[in-house]
Structure formats: structure tokens, C-alpha cells
Amino acid sequence: MKISYFIRRGKKTSRRSHFIKMKKNIITTQLFKPDNAFIFFSGIHGSVNRATYKYKISKTFGRFLAHISCLICILSKRIFVLSFSVIGSFCHPSIVHFDCLLFFLDTTPCL
């Protein structure tokens, strides 16, 4: 599955009622084996921007927290934590949303 298939010139493209944002807003990570797992998040930066406005922290620091939180959870193989609790640790839960979450694992049950 290629990410460039979903992204066309930085505009929103809909596919199966999921909205995918620009390439810079996407965090992709492959776990275990490339054929075995694929995680696709978009909208993290949107929720970080709202959180930085509400809690008056810098956007750079908010993005840093988002990336570090995702990296720590991926390295510890606790993927389910990525959904709301990690981002919710520094964002208000009502403003956290993901435009698209595709999670495929052959060996592990889905969320």
C-alpha cells in the first residue's frame, strides 16, 4: 500500500469515507515486518494545534510530544495506547481525532 496513492498534490482526497490530509501531517510506521503491519495516522498535527492553542504551549513542543509519544509506544510494541491515551495525555480528549486510522496485523488482534 503506497501512501502517495492517497495523497494528490496536498489536497484532501476521500476514499471509503476516510479523509487523508497532506503528506507532512502523516506519520507512518511499519512494525515487525513490512508485510505484517501498517499504521497510518493523519490529523495528529491538527489536534496538536488545537491543544497548543488551548494550553498555550508552542506548536513545536506539541509536535515533539506527539512524535516522541508515538515512537515510545511503537518501540514498546504497545500499539493500542496510540489511539487516545497517549495523545490525550497532553491534549484534551474531546479535541483529539484521527481522520484515518488503518491498522492491519496478521498476528495480533485489531483494536
Curated annotation (Swiss-Prot):
One of its GO terms (cellular component) is mitochondrial membrane. It is a single-pass membrane protein. The chain crosses the membrane at residues 60-80. It is found in: Mitochondrion membrane. It comes from the Eukaryota. Keywords: Membrane, Mitochondrion, Transmembrane, Transmembrane helix. Its main location: mitochondrion. This is Uncharacterized mitochondrial protein AtMg01370. It comes from Arabidopsis thaliana.
